[in-house]
From Swiss-Prot:
GO terms for biological process: mRNA splicing, via spliceosome. It holds the Pfam family SKIP_SNW. GO terms for cellular component: spliceosomal complex. Belongs to the SNW family. It is found in: Nucleus. Residues 618-631 have a biased composition (Polar residues). Residues 1-62, 88-112, 347-573, 605-685 are annotated as: Disordered. This is Protein snwA. Keywords: Nucleus. Residues 399-494, 508-556, 646-685 have a biased composition (Basic and acidic residues).
Length: 685
């Protein structure tokens, strides 16, 4: 049969502790062997406590260490158990405590004995001790009934005893406080009385002289200690001994750091985003480095680009819509303007047609009357016919020239009418050119007006255009009527002259009328421009130049250089101050006269507004003047004796007669005085 050692592998290392082997321990001495034998004998002779077996431990209370034997606590016994004094707290130092010292256990426990009072009640308050007053009974809650003996005042001895006891207790507390506040080096030593010792030396030298001479009494006194003396002994701090050397760290030799490594390990200084107490100018890159801005990559969301693109598309669409709307409005305005021009042109054409029809009828009547006298005197009839030719416009003139050859077939008449036709055509061409220039000027003025109006706000444009068109239409109609009247008058005057003079006067008249028309248009445009400017200033809340300069103060005018102050030497200096050889005392005036200035300060219209007291207004009015004053009526409306008379008299009064006596009043009669009305009946009769 193989052993266990043969089955196990052979150990690599064998450790042997020779000190624990009993063969290598030193042999004890005989005396020690005897003591050990005696202790072993006592332990063997000591009776061992028998612990009941499991199931038979009813009523068993383990309290000491030996009650547990070699084991632990008994779980079936429901009391507090401390095997081997494990978990026991506190060691009693009082003399009346029960001390258990068994099997080398040095723990002490304080057990309070159970005590009862006179009635047999257990005194549970004994557990708390006797340090203070305890109220554990019902009688402690009831007010105590003091007897007459207890309520008596204490005598002087008791008062003094209580006073001394209280004083000593307070002094003890105060002295303890003072000692704790003193220096630790100072130690108060209690003063002890001197000690007397009788000293007798021993007879070691063998002298047999009188012993009384050798004995002496020694007085022992403590040496006085200086309270301010520094400590004699220096407390040296214990130096820590070096422990075992640190374990060596096996690592490769240090290598030289590169620039990149140094930059990676650089810790930037902290820069606050809220405070800069020293006012340093810190660049933005330093702030980003301190905040760690370069450590993280900035990621921009794609929605920013989408949002920007959407805004751009929306803006382009809005611009296109606005431009289309503006183009549509411009076209509508152009159409409206063309429509108004067509309407005005048609109105002018209708007026011309109407005037030409009236002139044609008048001309035919005159031609019929002239044809009767044509056989008598051809030359005179031609002159009269030229004089009687009424002023006509272009259409009537062209129609008349067409009808003239049909009436007269003579060659002279043809030549005369041909000359007249040429003159009329030339005048018509001049008038057409003038009309074209006038229309071009008016169109330019309208274009300039439209360009100015386009710069105004869109809200006021419609109203302003309508107002301008209405004003222009009225002015144009007025000018056309004036021109037609002037043309008719001048043509009637010019037709009376000779043919050669009429052609020259026609050119001069056209030139003069054109010049006057241009001047009128210029004045009209200037007035219109001034009105528009004032309108814009009023709409914007600004004042016009006239109102602004009129409302300025004199100080503002002086500051702006607009005040035209005319200064003269007479107004600045007094003339009496010049050409005098002495001071003011010679020739300036008397002391009682008030002629300091050469002329009054205010003159003209300003002097009329200055208050001047009347010369006769002195405080010398008499009682008669006050009584004669008309207080209730007009001046001079007083009665006889200077008594004032009011404007409106009371009813039932008559001031035609003067009063000679005092005022007599009639007593008002009551109905009780005449109950039957006899007085009224007598008055009626």
């Amino acid at each position: 049969m193989t052993s266990l050692s043969s089955l196990l592998p052979k150990p690599k290392n064998v450790y042997s502790n020779e000190e624990e082997d009993p063969l290598f321990q030193p042999k004890p001495k005989p005396q020690q062997q005897k003591q050990q034998q005696q202790q072993q004998q006592e332990l063997n002779d000591k009776p061992k406590k028998v612990i009941p077996t499991y199931g038979n431990r009813k009523g068993y209370l383990p309290k000491n260490i030996e009650d547990f034997g070699d084991g632990g606590a008994f779980p079936e016994i429901h009391i507090v158990q401390y095997p081997l004094d494990m978990g026991r707290k506190g060691k009693s130092k009082s003399s009346n405590s029960n001390t258990s010292n068994m099997n080398g256990g040095g723990t002490t426990t304080s057990i309070v004995p159970v005590s009862v009072d006179s009635t047999g009640r257990v005194k549970h308050e004994a557990i708390l001790g006797e340090k203070g007053s305890l109220h554990s009974q019902y009688k402690d809650l009831i007010p105590k009934q003091h007897t007459e003996h207890e309520l008596q005042r204490p005598d002087d001895d008791e008062l003094q005893e209580t006073l001394d006891r209280t004083k000593n207790a307070l002094e003890k507390i105060v002295n303890g406080k003072i000692k704790s506040s003193k220096s630790t080096n100072y130690v108060e030593v209690e003063k002890k009385s001197a000690t007397y010792i009788k000293y007798t030396p021993s007879n070691q030298l063998g002298s047999n002289n009188g012993s009384a001479l050798n004995s002496k009494i020694v007085r022992m006194v403590d040496v006085a200690q200086d309270p301010l003396e520094p400590p004699k002994y220096k407390i040296k701090k214990k130096i820590m001994e070096h422990g075992s050397p640190p374990a060596p760290v096996m690592h490769s030799p240090t290598r030289k750091l590169s620039v990149q490594d140094q930059q990676d390990w650089t810790i930037p200084p902290c820069v606050s985003n809220w405070k800069n107490p020293k006012g340093f100018a810190i660049s933005i890159d330093k702030r980003l480095v301190s905040n760690g801005g370069g450590l993280q990559d900035v990621e921009i969301n794609d929605k920013f680009a989408h949002f920007t693109q959407a805004l751009y598309i929306a803006e382009s669409n809005a611009r296109e819509e606005v431009s289309a709307r503006a183009e549509l409005e411009r076209k509508l305005a152009q159409k409206e303007k063309e429509r108004k021009q067509d309407m005005l042109r048609k109105l002018a054409e209708d007026v011309r047609n109407e005037r030409s029809g009236i002139i044609q009828q008048r001309y035919t009547r005159k031609d019929n009357s002239d044809s009767d006298n044509d056989n008598d005197n051809d030359s005179s009839s031609d002159e009269d016919k030229n004089k009687r030719t009424p002023p006509m416009n272009r259409r009537s003139r062209s129609r008349s020239t067409e009808r003239i050859p049909s009436r007269n077939d003579n060659d002279d008449d043809d030549d005369r009418y041909r000359i007249k036709d040429n003159r009329d055509n030339r005048g018509r061409d001049n008038i057409d050119s003038r009309d074209n220039r006038d229309s071009r000027d008016s169109r330019d003025s309208r274009d300039s007006r439209d360009s100015r109006d386009s710069r105004d706000s869109r809200d006021n444009r419609d109203s302003r255009d309508s107002r301008d068109n209405r004003d222009n239409r009225d002015n144009r109609r007025r000018d056309d009527s004036n021109d037609r009247d002037r043309y008719s008058k001048r043509r009637s005057d010019s037709d009376s002259d000779s043919d050669s003079d009429s052609s020259d006067s026609e050119d001069e008249r056209v030139r003069r009328e054109r010049k006057e028309k241009l001047e009128r248009d210029k004045i009209r445009m200037e007035k219109k421009r001034e009105l528009e400017r004032e309108y814009r200033l009023e709409a914007s809340g600004k004042k016009s130049k006239f109102n602004r300069d009129q409302d300025r103060d004199i100080s503002e005018k002086i500051a702006l250089g607009q005040a035209s102050i005319k200064r003269t030497e007479d107004s600045i200096y007094d003339q009496r101050l010049f050409n005098q050889s002495e001071s003011l005392t010679s020739g300036f005036g008397n002391d009682d006269s008030y002629n300091v200035y050469s002329k009054p300060l205010f003159g003209g219209a300003v002097s009329n507004s200055i208050y001047r007291p009347k010369s006769n207004q002195e405080d010398n009015t008499s009682i008669q003047d006050v009584l004669s004053n008309s207080r209730f009526g007009k001046e001079g409306g007083s009665g006889s004796g200077g008594v004032p008379r009011p404007n409106k008299e009371f009813s039932g009064t008559d001031r035609s007669k003067d009063r000679t006596g005092p005022v007599a009043f009639e007593k008002e009669k009551k109905k009780s005085d005449d109950p039957f009305g006899f007085d009224d009946f007598s008055k009626k009769r």
